[in-house]
Curated annotation (Swiss-Prot):
It is an enzyme of class 2 (transferase). Pathway: Amino-acid biosynthesis; L-lysine biosynthesis via DAP pathway; LL-2,6-diaminopimelate from (S)-tetrahydrodipicolinate (acetylase route): step 1/3. Gene3D superfamilies: Hexapeptide repeat proteins, Malonyl-CoA ACP transacylase, ACP-binding. Belongs to the transferase hexapeptide repeat family. DapH subfamily. Signal peptide: none annotated. Its EC number is 2.3.1.89. This is 2,3,4,5-tetrahydropyridine-2,6-dicarboxylate N-acetyltransferase. InterPro entries: DapH, DapH_N, Hexapep, Hexapep_transf_CS, Trans_hexapeptide_repeat, Trimer_LpxA-like_sf. It comes from the Bacteria. One of its GO terms (molecular function) is tetrahydrodipicolinate N-acetyltransferase activity. Catalyzes the transfer of an acetyl group from acetyl-CoA to tetrahydrodipicolinate. PANTHER family: 2,3,4,5-TETRAHYDROPYRIDINE-2,6-DICARBOXYLATE N-ACETYLTRANSFERASE, ACETYLTRANSFERASE.
Length: 236
């Protein structure tokens, strides 16, 4: 079944209809030689087993063979998850431990996703863009090239409340720590959003906005560019 992931209602339907998954990893010491491991990924040496699979299938094996099991440890990091995480192996970007990136996200060359950042389904992260610690890019949020999304900042998604237009952050924008960009807002090229601002309306190119709600306080000048310049070495 296909879904139009540019439509917030279609994204919601995709999440609703997706098969929910509770994958676990089980480390087991015991005799499981007569078990059926269909649909379970198994690695073993003698009586030592590592199992990867859905919780209900592995837990059935553990329960049926509890008299043969000496030790068991289970690791779990989600429950009834609807959307898998992005396969990051072939992405040419720096993604630090603890970042959470869901499937169907696009990440450009030499982007940086820092610890604790969350990037939701359908989002696009441009080339050379940094999503700093604990920042959030909501569903279908679009960040252009060489953007800096500051620590704890939020780019709202399209799901709740539903919005047909995603947030769009154009190239070379700097968004300060803990700023919030509300649903459907567009930030023009080269602009700066001050830390802690709440942006409720579109922002033109090459201006500085601040406050709650954010207002234009000046145009970007040489001093502003010097204070907000990015470091290429962080993106290598």
């Amino acid at each position: 079944m296909s879904y139009n992931l540019t439509d917030p209602y279609e994204i919601a339907r995709y999440i609703k209809e997706a098969k929910k998954s509770t994958p676990i990893k089980a480390y087991i010491e015991g005799d499981l030689s007569n078990c059926d491991f269909t649909n379970i990924e198994k690695f073993n040496s003698g009586d030592l087993y590592i199992l990867f699979g859905e919780s209900e299938e592995i837990l059935v094996i553990i329960e049926k063979n509890k008299d043969k099991i000496k030790n068991c440890r289970i690791e779990q990091d989600r429950r009834k998850s609807a959307i898998p995480l992005l396969d990051m192996l072939k992405i040419n970007a720096r993604i630090e431990p603890g970042a959470t990136i869901r499937d169907k996200v696009i990440i450009g060359e030499n982007a940086v996703i820092m610890m604790g950042a969350v990037v939701n389904i359908g989002a696009e992260i441009g080339e050379g863009t940094m999503v700093d610690m604990n920042a959030v890019v909501g569903a279908r949020g679009k960040l252009g090239k060489n953007v800096h999304l500051g620590a704890g900042a939020v780019v709202a998604g399209v799901l709740e409340p539903p919005s047909s237009d995603p947030c769009t952050i154009e190239d070379n924008v700097l968004i300060g720590a803990n700023a919030v960009i509300l649903e459907g807002v567009k930030i023009g090229k080269g602009s700066v959003v001050a830390a802690g601002s709440i942006v409720t309306t579109d922002v033109p190119e090459n201006v500085v906005v601040a406050g709650a709600p954010a207002k234009i306080i000046k145009e970007v000048d040489v001093k502003t560019k010097d204070k907000t310049k990015l470091l290429d070495d962080l993106r290598k």
